Amino acid sequence: MARRCDICGKGPLVGNNVSHANNKSKTRSLPNLRSVRATVDGTVKHVRVCTRCLKAGKVVKVAHGASRASARA
């Protein structure tokens, strides 16, 4: 499973750790992803969303057990 936000597409960044002797080793900076139950096209799905999209309100979270309550009614 890719470490990528399902909403904005944010993924890992690649860079270098540079020592005083100018030796370089690769480093990866991963996005802060959360697995969230959200409504997508009217259905409840698990999506991986970065915290920036969560704070911006781009995702409508579903309360735990809400899909079962609607199925009973």
Swiss-Prot record:
Q: Which GO terms describe its cellular component?
A: ribonucleoprotein complex; ribosome
State the Gene Ontology terms under molecular function: structural constituent of ribosome
Any Gene Ontology biological process: translation
- Please indicate which superkingdom the organism of origin belongs to: Bacteria
Disulphide bonds annotated for this chain are none
Q: Which Pfam families match?
A: Ribosomal_L28
This protein is called Large ribosomal subunit protein bL28
Lineage here is: Bacteria, Pseudomonadati, Myxococcota, Myxococcia, Myxococcales
Which gene codes for it? rpmB
